[in-house]
């Protein structure tokens, strides 16, 4: 790049050469001497020159100014060709004695090559007077002749679409069928030109030539740099790193001016190869350098897009058949409605072809885990589908901007929404359908889509499904019995069921969404949980408070209550999550039953049936959970009754320490059930339904046994009751307003089962009683019970008078048989444990207790009792005055405080409704209607005396009573007379 310092040496005789540049005259002209040493380095033409010629001294023969001008013009063309082609193609270097020769003209060093000797001969031997050099045209192109029959050269446009280059050139007439005319695709065209000059050369060229040379240095430096910035250079470097197809290798050709170029009607360089708005070619000029022979210029015209590749012709043809490379093969997205931005399943079948009408969900039938209906299944659980159908039929207000769309089942196959965008037409999978049994039936219907984010229980069918929402979707290993928190909330028409931690193995909650709320699951709740908790912590049961639209349920919901600004263009996953939460608010509004049509009523009835079945499953789980949670606390906080000979049915009953709350069907209770590990602290569920008939039959014969014989028979029975306790009594579905109605209750309100009722009936003079009932609704005392009660305290002289009074009442009255349950007084919360005692003293050595404490605790855990058994005269003789309270009388005003009538009932015969004699676990506030219906039916029943020798019951009113010192009141002789 720098001029070499010349050293003086002996004058060497010039070597004869036919070329005019072979002789260098010796001159001291500084202007001409500067060009002398470099004249012999031109494209390897002077191969005969010795290496010593390169260090020729000033004393060599001097050239004329015209010869120096010819050298500048010749090297201007040849050096430009070397710079351009060295950056595009690989040229073989020229060597001399094993040394690569370098061309240093215009202070730019490039390697000499023998490849351009013949192509550049015209410009090497030209001069500015006799043979002016023609314009030098250099074209860089792609050779199409290198393509095979099954290959096509294509160009990729800015949008990534492929275009056939040969077809584009043929369209503009640049190619014909002859093989020789397929010159290729021109990428660049360089033009080096010497413009026209004066007829006569100026006389002072010696001072002008150094300026021309210096200006040319600037031009060649620009040419060297700019040639490496054009698209063709980038293309060549990209394909030089790999083994390219021969058709993709850059080729060049050197042409002489316009007259020497073979071209067709249209210029192949400017023909557009693909449609587009941008320019096809661009031009850059390196400026003009003035010289005595004329202006020297360099110009390049190049294609702006050089992204070429070779593809298989068959693949390119197939692409055209499919819509010219997906031009007409677009996803089936709606373009005429407001849901164009929402994600939808892509496929070759249009949406209209895949439309499936929604079947009538009200006509569907099946079990809790199967759902049979006409049409394709939507993957919904029965409860969620019925609930959604009822809510839609109720006429929820719809959004003014978006109509409610009917659901369409998603197609199992291609993933519906790869980015997790929600759509009203495509729903996510629901929570686990109800499985009341350990193993699901074989007909369990799988859902069509999956979630994302979450795990899948082992008993659920596999799902073909989309990926996740904002995270990679994947099948995670199912949980193995992980205890989780079950949450459920109360429906408007049902009382709340308290939630608790489940102690039984249960599938882990399925997370519908990967959100920041996932760490909040696992909390206990005393009441109904929110809908969000229910959805995020579902443990396998469909909750009452679940949203109207269950993901994947196939039932669309009304988006009226969603936020107004995110209904149309919101494609975010979190917005869909919030929309689903807002849609659930429709469940909080009460519906007018008059507005529901006939189909809606059938749907509601089916929904109620499923909800009752759900409660049976829920009560079992909650009871087991509560028994584990409440077992340690019940021992320390409750009052334990002695488990001795005076214990009730061989089990101790815990008494609540938090009285004062009325019993109501809408009261929340903490569930508790007996356990094998806690038989000493909870009521025993030990007797079956068949034992109840045996005990009732045995009651009629107990009056004829002696007290000692009766005690001997009771002891083994009590031991048997303790040893044969069942672990869990699974409750049945709730049936309102019948004696066998059972529901989940708190630990303090858990009542004994019917077998316990029979055992307590041995000494308790009354059955279960609803606290909400008034005293005036109590049943009257039967005659046989009054006889036994009074004979225990009335002397023999007064017995005859009482019997005569009873016989008189028998002729005029009728016995009233009351099998409905009644309630006993609360066990007083004293520090020492007490056994349960009847209100009035009677036989079998059990004293009465009658604390003057009214019924104030609705949460007290009290046992239910049946009517008292028959007592013989022998029992009465040794019985008078016995008991804890010494046979004292009980004032009637201490019993519920509002009535002087005592509630005694007795019926030793088999009741008419034996299938419905199971007592309530807790009394209901609205039991009055059922009570009155039972009273009406009681009038037509046979009297107890007709079957067992008793007399018809007669209502008696209490007379004066006495109170013994140190004990509660008791009934004394002659305290009862016929009620007027």
From Swiss-Prot:
Highest taxon in the source lineage: Eukaryota
Gene3D superfamilies registered for this protein in UniProt: 6.10.140.1900, HORMA domain
Alphabetic keyword roster: Autophagy, Cytoplasm, Protein transport, Transport
UniProt region (Disordered), positions on chain: 1-68, 344-364, 391-415, 436-569, 654-763, 786-917, 931-980
Membrane-spanning ranges: none
Cell location: Cytoplasm; Preautophagosomal structure
Sequence ranges of Low complexity compositional bias: 8-23, 396-410, 493-504, 538-549, 654-665, 738-753, 940-951
Gene Ontology, cellular component aspect: Atg1/ULK1 kinase complex; cytosol; phagophore assembly site
Regions of compositional bias (Polar residues) in chain numbering: 54-68, 553-567, 786-817
Biased composition (Basic and acidic residues): 700-723
GO BP, sorted A to Z: mitophagy; piecemeal microautophagy of the nucleus; protein localization to phagophore assembly site; protein transport
Chain's role: Activates the ATG1 kinase in a nutritional condition dependent manner through the TOR pathway, leading to autophagy. Also involved in cytoplasm to vacuole transport (Cvt) and more specifically in Cvt vesicle formation. Seems to play a role in the switching machinery regulating the conversion between the Cvt pathway and autophagy. Finally, ATG13 is also required for glycogen storage during stationary phase.
Similarity remark: Belongs to the ATG13 family. Fungi subfamily.
Entry-linked PANTHER family: AUTOPHAGY-RELATED PROTEIN 13 (PTHR13430:SF4), PTHR13430
Subunit structure: Interacts with ATG1 to form the ATG1-ATG13 kinase complex.
Record-given protein name: Autophagy-related protein 13
Organism of derivation: Coccidioides immitis (strain RS)
Taxonomic classification: Eukaryota, Fungi, Dikarya, Ascomycota, Pezizomycotina
